[in-house]
Amino acid sequence: MWFLFAAASAICFGLRGILYQWTSQRPIDRNLLLLGVYLSGTVIAAVINLFAGQPWSEGCWVGVWMGLFSFISNASMYRGFAVGKASLIAMFTGLPPVVVVILAYVLWGEKLNLWQSMAFLVIVFGILMIRYSNDISLRNLQGAQWGIITMIAFGITDLSSKKATMLGAATLPTLLMMYVTGSLLFGISWYMSRRRLASARAMVAAAAEDQEAESSPPAASANRGWSSSKTLFWGMFVGITNISGMMLVMPAFKLGVTGLVSVVIAMNVVFVLLYARFILKERFSRLEAGGLTCALIGVLILRLAA
């Protein structure tokens, strides 16, 4: 049963990845977008729990850690994309299951049997093949530190989800704590970035106040971006896929082995790859095709092992 929850979660996160990919081509404020994603999760979790009436417990406070490390992972990932090679950061985002397997063994003594280990390695290898790019080299690892932080933070987010289930925390209250924490952090981040942008614009305006003819092009450029309200509401729409996935993640971790659940969820990248191939008409490289095949073989081994 855990596999069905994890696979359904991967589909939801795959849809989220597709929406993120589409949104990345638009002139928007990413912090405001992510604020919308987490604000949507807050509202949906709160409303559903009004009817579901899931109980609150001390374990629900683990959701604060989930929100914190989710914020750190997203912030580090975007920072890595800004200062480093996109292909390198993308590769690190495929490695959190490795962190999860190692820490789950250290913390809780969880072990994989031979077939589970084989399936895990094949799936991780397939994910890395999909994310690998020929422009990655040992001589050019700029931004690698942000990729490592991203990898660890995503892994700890998964482990926090598992810990919440071990403490008997209900899904909706835990997610509500996670999304409230994330909303606050992304809201602060958006506010600070907006203040910095306003300060920079004021400096430019002061320097160019005697050149009125040259002050209109920047304004026209700014108008091409999405408005704050449009970005926020789009983020809230994307957030529906995010919380749908998270509502499936927690029962998957409750029923399954932590590392295996994490690696199945990480296969959401496959759906983004299929979207790029069949909707955007992008051709698979040999590595991507091989990685897709490996990942599917790994899932087959995992099902046979079960």
Give the residues covered by each predicted segment.
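Membrane-interface interhelical linkers
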Residues: 1-65, 75-84, 132-148, 180-255, ...
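Juxtamembrane helix-start motifs in multi-pass secondary transporters
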Residues: 33-34, 89, 173-174, 261
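C-terminal transmembrane-helix exit sites in multi-pass transporters
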Residues: 49, 77, 97-118, 128, ...
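Hydrophobic transmembrane alpha-helices of multi-pass small-molecule transport proteins
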Residues: 38-45, 103-105, 115-132, 287-306
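Hydrophobic/small/kink-forming positions within alpha-helical transmembrane segments
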Residues: 14, 18, 46, 67, ...
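Alpha-helical transmembrane segments of compact multi-pass small-molecule transporters, enriched
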Residues: 40-44, 92-106, 121-122, 181-185, ...
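Selected transmembrane alpha-helices and immediately adjacent juxtamembrane segments
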Residues: 2, 142-173
